[in-house]
UniProtKB/Swiss-Prot annotation:
Keywords, in A-Z order: Amidation, Amphibian defense peptide, Antimicrobial, Secreted
Leucine amide: residues carrying this PTM: 21
Biological processes annotated in GO: defense response
Transmembrane segment boundaries: none
Protein name: Peptide PGLa-R6
Lineage of the organism: Eukaryota, Metazoa, Chordata, Craniata, Vertebrata
Localisation per UniProt entry: Secreted
Tissues expressing the protein: Expressed by the skin glands.
Amino acid sequence: GMASTAGSVLGKLAKTAIGIL
């Protein structure tokens, strides 16, 4: 649902940020 979708998006953003840093 909404929670899992939000978690997935946050996970992708976190991985992207880590990749950039």
